[in-house]
Amino acid sequence: MTTVISARVSGLRSTPSKLNLVADLIRGQDVSTAVMYLKFCRKKAAFLVGKVLKSAVANARANYDVDLDSLYVKEVLVGKSFTLRRVRPRARGRACRIRKRYGSVVIRLLKR
């Protein structure tokens, strides 16, 4: 039986489309390779996804006592979380709505 190690974070202050760009980099990679990709990627979303990946690795180390060299990223699920709505005043008494979108990330690791 294979154990799937996962970590989930909701409410990340980045849009799901930006998180998905970074998630595409690490899908199917070894954990050490994925950490290197995220370390040298110059995006804010890479920092956020990297924290979730480190949490999944910490879960593997603490709960399952797994060798970290044998882990790889099985799947990275990116979804949308809540949306904050703000109002921006415009000309002639009108107003526009500003949508500040938040994302959620689930990372699942598997042993090779």
Swiss-Prot record:
* GO BP annotation list: translation
Please provide one cellular component term from the Gene Ontology annotations of this protein: cytosolic large ribosomal subunit
Which GO molecular function, any one, fits this protein according to its record? structural constituent of ribosome
Keywords, alphabetical? Ribonucleoprotein, Ribosomal protein, RNA-binding, rRNA-binding
> Would you identify the family this protein belongs to, as annotated?
Belongs to the universal ribosomal protein uL22 family.
Subunit structure as annotated in this protein's UniProt entry:
Part of the 50S ribosomal subunit.
The UniProt entry, under HAMAP family, shows: Ribosomal_uL22_B (MF_01331_B)
Instruction: Quote the function comment for this protein.
Output: This protein binds specifically to 23S rRNA; its binding is stimulated by other ribosomal proteins, e.g. L4, L17, and L20. It is important during the early stages of 50S assembly. It makes multiple contacts with different domains of the 23S rRNA in the assembled 50S subunit and ribosome.
| Protein name in the entry | Large ribosomal subunit protein uL22
Provenance organism: Anaplasma marginale (strain Florida)
